[in-house]
Swiss-Prot record:
Protein name as annotated: Probable cytosol aminopeptidase
Source lineage: Bacteria, Pseudomonadati, Pseudomonadota, Alphaproteobacteria, Caulobacterales
Sequence similarity: Belongs to the peptidase M17 family.
Keyword Transferase attributed: no
InterPro entries per UniProt: Leucine_aapep/pepB, Macro_dom-like, Peptidase_M17_C, Peptidase_M17_leu_NH2_pept, Peptidase_M17_N
Cofactor: Mn(2+)
Alphabetical UniProt keywords: Aminopeptidase, Cytoplasm, Hydrolase, Manganese, Metal-binding, Protease
GO cellular component, one term: cytoplasm
GO annotation, biological process: proteolysis
Domain of life: Bacteria
Amino acid sequence: MRIEFVPVDTQAGATAALAVLAHEGAALSPEARAANEATGGALARAIAGGRFTGAKGQTLDIVAPNGLEAARVVLVGVDGSGAVEPEAVELAAASAFQAVKTSGVVELVLKLGADAETAARAAFGARLAAYRFDKYRTTEKAEKKPSVQVVKIAAADPVKAQKAYEPLAALADAIVFSRNLVSEPANILHPEEFAARAKGLESLGLEVEILGEAEMAKLGMGSLLGVGQGSVRESQLVIMKWMGAADKSAQPIAFVGKGVCFDTGGISIKPADGMEDMKWDMGGAAAVAGVMHALAGRKAKVNAIGVLGLVENMPDGNAQRPGDVVTSMSGQTIEVINTDAEGRLVLADALWYTQERFKPQFMIDLATLTGAIIISLGHDYAGLFSNNDGLSEKLLAAGKAERESLWRLPLPAAYEKQIESPIADMKNIGGRPAGSITAGLFLQKFVNGVPWAHLDIASVAWKKPSADPTVPDGAVGYGVRLLNRLVADAYEG
């Protein structure tokens, strides 16, 4: 799909849909009023007969009445009665696209506000709504295929709007990259392939280094390597660097991602029902790769590190067993009670490596870590755990701004008893009570004096069904927007 910015007097044409806004109570925007007048009040009559109220995200899609150069007209509700906020424009553009994407029209003309920032945000919403992962489909009914090939956004100054869209386009590219990683089947996206795709981002100016099992063994990463020892696919540690600050020696920020490219549970094997979804157990690593893509794509003025721990958790004769004891890079020993609590074992070494090598300002890890977070928070919030109030507040604010919501949960020392082991320094699981919290407490043992936050994104990495028009069913790309906003608002010089 192609994005174009066009003058405000552009007509939709015979094969296009026109989208305009309506406020709460079905009050028409200036663009909608003009369309209504051109049709002799036909839009107002359609509203009266269609129970359209102008509620946020509500759409009314009709065949274009006489008087308009268009095939269809889409009214999109945005609530309120005054100025339309950028978020509302983004959602309205996405809703309009969803309303007509398979209607047969080949163009969608968005007249949602003429200033450059509004037009840019509309383009961003449409771009995200157009995401579709169907590369392996060889047959599909024509009426189910997306027909919209071009989205034209009306702007008072199309050149200025295009300029305003550039950083959002870079962010959209990064979100799509992350969604594609999560959507790929595990026979395609194994650790080596994931690492290769990360390496491909060097074209954006990133530096990418890949450590294999031999290098990790020399570093003493027994915790991470134990997870992957049952797979024929070699585990990988990917280090991504973006040095965008004026001072290249300035202390970087760091993101660490869990990348279990497929999780059978290992010897503690999962039930067959739903196991296919475990292809997205690398959603944390996909988010980290995505935010590094975004920072490089928009040339962010910050030094940033992304570290991806990539493994497959498979059961074979060489697989890790319940009861095994492994030694992490930190020197701490771990009794593996359950091989399906593997993500924290990967992160233990990845976190330690990151802080020891790069001495970052802070570390944020992202992981589809626990099913317990879904029980706690449902599918609208990710869990936030942190040793630093300031970092937590910045993350919460960024999440609210980008509709990637977080809820902070505690890390009470009293719960550490649940992960005590009689034969090692700790065990990797603490039982059913407070499962997300004890997982966070486990990770905290591998953080040595660095401000740190852990985002448990198991609840939000995959949405089906999705209620957000910018997130089609499936991979969300959760974390890319959130962390990009965090950097832009708080850490760019």
